[in-house]
Regions:
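Surface loop/turn motifs at the tips and blade-to-blade linkers of beta-strand repeat domains
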Residues: 32-39, 77-81, 135
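Short loop/turn segments immediately following beta-strands, especially the blade-tip
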Residues: 18-26, 69-71, 122-128
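Beta-rich, blade/repeat-based domains predominating
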Residues: 1-5, 36-53, 82-97, 105
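Beta-rich catalytic cores
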Residues: 11, 29, 42, 60, ...
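Conserved beta-strand positions in repeat-built beta-propeller and related beta-rich domains
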Residues: 5-12, 54-59, 97-106, 111
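Structural signal for beta-propeller blades
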Residues: 13-16, 62-64, 106-108, 118
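Blade-level signature of beta-propeller repeat domains, shared across WD40, Kelch, NHL, RCC1
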Residues: 89-136
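Flexible "stalk/tail and boundary" regions
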Residues: 65-76, 90, 98
């Protein structure tokens, strides 16, 4: 809706929301929109879908979650075969694929051979229309 900015604050395991004034480019004070338990890992990268729902990557918890931010409600969880999930973004000609990035190190490749892969899922929704930068 271009009126709310979401910020993932990994160290505090929270998502903060700021009212955003598009005309003036200013932010209101932050409020905690979601606070995660330790079992949820660290929230990391995120993206919005065309319905305005927030998709969040969970570092250390092997999952992506989808949230209704208006209601503050978890809608869906997608499990992944690797723990270090870093971010997600919609792509493809119709923006109907969700690409999920993961991380690896030498220790993670033996127990998790797919660590470091980019996964593609079709979540049944699309990404938002692309916003073009006017330049300047």
């Amino acid at each position: 809706d271009a009126r709310t900015l979401y910020y993932i604050d990994s160290p505090t395991r929270s998502v903060q929301a700021f009212a955003f004034d598009l005309e003036h480019g200013t932010l209101g004070p932050p409020r905690v929109a979601i606070r995660f338990a330790e079992a949820d890992g660290l929230p990391d990268g995120c993206t919005l879908d065309a319905e305005g729902h927030l998709w969040i990557a969970h570092w250390g918890a092997a999952k992506i979650t989808r949230w209704d931010m208006g209601a503050g409600r978890l809608l869906h969880t997608i499990a992944l075969p690797v723990r270090r999930v870093t971010s997600c973004a919609f792509g493809g000609p119709q923006r109907n694929h969700l690409f999920i990035t993961t991380a690896m190190d030498e220790k993670s490749t033996a127990p998790e051979p797919e660590a470091g892969y980019i996964f593609r899922i079709d979540p049944g929704t699309t990404g938002p229309e692309l916003a073009c930068f006017a330049g300047g």
